[in-house]
Amino acid sequence: MAKQAKGMKSITNLAFEKTYGQMPSDGTWYQQPINKNALTGKQSLIQSNTITGRRDMTEPGIGQMDASGQLELPLDVRNIGNILKGLFGAPTTTAGTKEGTYKHVFKVTDEIPSLTIEKGFPDIGLFFTYTGTKFNKFSLTAQVGNNETTYTVDTMASNETEAKKTAATAPTALKLTRFNNVNASVKEGGTALATCRKMQLDINNNLDGDTYCLNGSSIRPSINEGMSEITGNIETLFEDDAQLQKAMNSTETSLELEFTRDNFSLTFSVPEVILERATPGISGPKGITQTLNFRGYYADDTGNSIITVTLINDVATY
């Protein structure tokens, strides 16, 4: 009986491309820890309506290649840096305040890099590579409860190819050190929001993947960046109307989600935010919570970005 591929033996590797859609011939490959990898290539079959005088349908047509899918990853101290680089572009890196640490600051840029991502099944000797991959949407939820802290990245790629051996012969594996929900804290308007139970943050690059051309292939020749969009929500204990009043009056505020572990930290700062009005309901006898959606924007903040992500760890460069 043939061997079945096992998820626990699978690998996900990534490398940044120098030219869009071309697997790098040099540079560093990274082995990325994942919880799930749904990146896949799909090519639809088009039903034929051709009439030939028989009841039998004729050969179907072949559609465009759609290489895309979602990655679910553990929130960690080091590997998150490569994901943030794919989401924003290369960071500005300086020495950290603690010995042996580095401060990486990510902001919105006009263009984001492309990657080659490899999804491998080494136990059966099959490897699928996705060239021209860009990160479209990042979603992270910090919340109370005994939940593993993970995040998702929606990807869009140019093409999928199959190989019998890995393209990443000696990938770099950064040590996995987790950030946990118990390491999280939230600030609103620059002040600790001690009653916060949950914060969801969505970063959307609004990529345009409808770039197919009549060029003799079925793949995307490019993927264009759209407007950077920041949305999400906060859930708090309903103890007063401090946040609700800001929502009712469309008062500008700010939000910050920070994870801290030892000398390392990860901070998402959205400096200009409007909370969406929604008064809390009553669903039973227990304590009342309120959930307010938010939307970030850029007007005049000195940080010159709709969002700033600061990662402090012991990795020298990304």
Q: What are the residue ranges of the model-derived segments?
A:
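Signature of extracytoplasmic/envelope-associated structural regions
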Residues: M1-Y318
